[in-house]
């Protein structure tokens, strides 16, 4: 089997297409994993697009978080082999049996997708748009694409919904900040160092080109960061200097506005799920989104406990 080429297998009650190529409007090819019912048909799609390496198991990427969650909430693991659990996105084993297709796309420059990493940028948002429209016209799709995910996978839903993709039918923003300046980089006008630390720990470790220095999938044993192994200077040239960029924009300027929600443009039916904790990041975005989005159909829920626990429980 050629490494990191599209391939299909049937296992655990699903038809799985690994590393499906998805071509962007500038010609760059991203890679997606598609989990779908074994039977033929056209089904609604749940899509996520983000930087955490689609093939990296939750248990391998975030072992302490996984262990705490399953010890305190053992129902998380019920009804699933948990082989396909991945950080902050849906478990396909719990959705595919209900006739959904689950699509996970590695964002530009991350996981198995090459390119330049520039988080929450207009380029990334356009990629997300292209992925939604791609999913909406596939032979296994009924043309209705929903978005669902936590944190990063929620934040970028606000952004892409502002572009109004024709095939976007609904969105579930689970703990997703919205105002790049106020929620994320400058709390009360004061610089937050969270993003620089996050970049080092959660993005650089799964950047495309980490290759043999990265992890392998516990499902298919392929490298989760693509077939190439790039040098440190090559990797650095393929990503924005995120912490420096944020620090160089101390005011709420065009840099921040380009990475923030445009509420009057968001008309998609939405479910906004906030956490009473995590005050330094997400809750404001969820409440603001519910109040200010132009969507006619919108719902708000607020929960406690950890960042992700309720998302994975029934």
Describe the predicted segments one by one:
Residues 272-274:
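Short beta-strand/loop motif that positions the catalytic acidic residue
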Residues 293-308:
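Catalytic histidine neighborhood in serine/cysteine hydrolases
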Residues 92-112:
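Conserved alpha/beta-hydrolase
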Residues 139-152:
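Alpha/beta-hydrolase fold nucleophile elbow
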Residues 86-87, 97, 119-139:
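Alpha/beta-hydrolase active-site loop
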Residues 153-165, 171, 289:
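Short glycine-enriched nucleophile-adjacent loop
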Residues 3-41, 45:
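N-terminal cap/lid segment of alpha/beta-hydrolase-fold proteins
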Residues 55, 59, 63-81, 85-92, ...:
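Accessory cap/linker subdomain of secreted extracellular hydrolases
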């Amino acid at each position: 089997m050629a490494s990191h080429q599209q391939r299909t297998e049937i296992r655990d009650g699903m038809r799985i297409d690994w590393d499906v190529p998805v071509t962007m409007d500038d010609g760059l090819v991203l890679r997606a994993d598609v989990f779908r019912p074994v039977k033929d048909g056209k089904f609604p799609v749940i899509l996520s697009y983000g930087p955490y390496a689609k093939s990296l198991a939750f248990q391998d990427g975030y072992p302490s978080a996984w262990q705490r969650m399953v010890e305190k909430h053992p129902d998380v693991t019920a009804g699933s082999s948990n082989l396909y659990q991945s950080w902050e996105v849906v478990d396909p084993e719990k959705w595919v049996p209900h006739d959904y297709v689950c699509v996970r796309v590695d964002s530009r420059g991350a996981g198995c997708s090459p390119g330049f990493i520039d988080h929450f940028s207009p380029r990334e948002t356009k990629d997300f748009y292209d992925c939604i429209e791609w999913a909406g016209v596939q032979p296994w799709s009924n043309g209705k694409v929903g978005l669902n995910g936590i944190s990063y996978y929620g934040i970028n839903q606000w952004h892409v919904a502002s572009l109004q993709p024709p095939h976007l039918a609904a969105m579930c923003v689970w703990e997703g900040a919205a105002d790049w300046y106020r929620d994320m980089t400058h709390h009360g006008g004061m610089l937050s160092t969270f993003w620089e630390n996050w970049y080092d720990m959660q993005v650089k470790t799964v950047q495309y080109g980490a290759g043999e220095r990265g992890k392998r999938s516990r499902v298919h044993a392929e490298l989760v960061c693509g077939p190439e192994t790039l040098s440190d200077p090559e990797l650095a040239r393929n990503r924005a200097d995120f912490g420096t960029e944020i620090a160089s924009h101390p005011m709420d300027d065009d840099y921040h506005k380009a990475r923030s929600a445009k509420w009057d443009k968001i008309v998609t039916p939405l479910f906004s799920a906030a956490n009473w904790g995590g005050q330094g990041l997400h809750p404001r975005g969820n409440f603001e989104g519910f109040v200010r989005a132009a969507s006619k159909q919108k719902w708000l829920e607020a929960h406690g406990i950890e960042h992700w626990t309720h998302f994975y429980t029934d």
